[in-house]
Amino acid sequence: MSSFLDYSVMSGEGSSCSVRAFHSDHGITTFQSCAVSVNNCGTDDRFMASRASPDGIPHQSYQAAVSSLGLAYGAHSACSSSYAPQSFCTTYNHYPLNQEVEPAAGFPQCGPLMYSGNISSSVVSQHRQGYGTTPLGQLQYTHSAYGAGHEQPSPFTGCSNPLSPLHAAHLEACCSPLSESASSAQTFDWMKVKRNPPKTGRSGEYGYGGQPNTVRTNFTTKQLTELEKEFHFNKYLTRARRVEIAAALQLNETQVKIWFQNRRMKQKKREKEGLLPTKPTSSDSGERNQEKVEDGESEKSVSAPSTPSPTSSTVSSGADSYPSN
């Protein structure tokens, strides 16, 4: 990735070396020599390569800042032993070079860089980190020194909420009924319906009155009178006669049919209990008539006087007519 790095190196003896490092991945690279004014270091040693920005952006020099990118370099072989590997911290800026960069793109922390002579483009590694709100060209990178033992808070506060407003509203809508039901049970109108206990069948005069949900037909006095009159003449009705009675009494066929069934059962039960006299059948009447005839004939034979028969009278008269000689 095209980038521009500008480092400011602080040495221990007051001597300074201004170092500018650029990636050499794209385009033509222009190298500039960096003279190091240290005791035993020669001027021909080049520590880092620089690359000029094609857009003509002026190079900016940054002061050393603590809690920034930590870099460590080893001492050159020509330098004296007093210049041991030292670490320095600095900040850097990013400039796009001949390549489009995504808006608000961030980069992760850079690792410590070790170098002893020349720096190649593969030393500095940069990776994408996330999305921010800083405009292009003014991206500032905050880095924590390695080995510091603490984490630096993330500068991206816009991504702290992992749920979008739509998902958050949906989550609240789903969780709110559960919390309400857990706290207090809600009573609905359909739960307040009064449920009457089922009515038990009451034993009447002629047994149970049927199921409690059966609608009982209340007959008027006129209807009962006409039904009793018809029952007196006909215990069983034909369908045509049932239709006529139902139409005359403003009833339906089923009501008339059921009334006659119940009336027949009541009649049989009363006859069994002896409350009503039993009507004579044809066989009984025949036997009774035969008995009456026999009784009448016996009475006539007993009451009639005894008269002599004509034969006996002729015999007696003939005997009297013949005299004895």
UniProtKB/Swiss-Prot annotation:
Protein location: Nucleus
PANTHER family per the UniProt record, alphabetical: HOMEOBOX PROTEIN HOX-A1, HOMEOBOX PROTEIN ROUGH-RELATED
Residues of the DNA-binding region: 212-271
Composition-biased stretches (Basic and acidic residues): 285-300
Bias (Low complexity) ranges: 301-317
InterPro entries: HD, HD_metazoa, Homeobox_CS, Homeodomain-like_sf, HXA1/B1/D1
Location of the motif Antp-type hexapeptide: 187-192
PROSITE patterns registered for this protein in UniProt: HOMEOBOX_1, HOMEOBOX_2
Family: Belongs to the Antp homeobox family. Labial subfamily.
Span list, region Disordered: 194-215, 264-325
Protein's job: Sequence-specific transcription factor which is part of a developmental regulatory system that provides cells with specific positional identities on the anterior-posterior axis.
Keywords: Developmental protein, DNA-binding, Homeobox, Nucleus, Transcription, Transcription regulation
A GO molecular-function annotation: DNA-binding transcription factor activity, RNA polymerase II-specific
One GO CC term on file: nucleus
Protein name listed in UniProt: Homeobox protein Hox-A1a
